[in-house]
Amino acid sequence: MKEINIIGFGLMGRQISALFYLLGYEIGVYNKSKPNIYEFEKQIKLLQRKIDFSNFNAGKINIYQHIEDLKNSLTIESLNEDLNLKKEIIQIL
């Protein structure tokens, strides 16, 4: 299974995660606060109404409490537009 990490699980992070989930990826998610899985599921349903994913098997989502636990995979950052926060996260990676 292909893997991808998403840092930040706000609106954009949930949308990106939902798309990759429907494309069959194993997604590693890190968010400072508890991720809103209900909103993630809503994004999945919205995408399924707009795009035919019948040729794909659903992926898997893993929620991590610590950013250091993310796998060594392609990582998409979807944090707030706060330069200091982004620098802090990039230094950890």
Predicted regions: what they are:
Residues 32-35, 49-93:
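Rossmann-like NAD(P)-binding element
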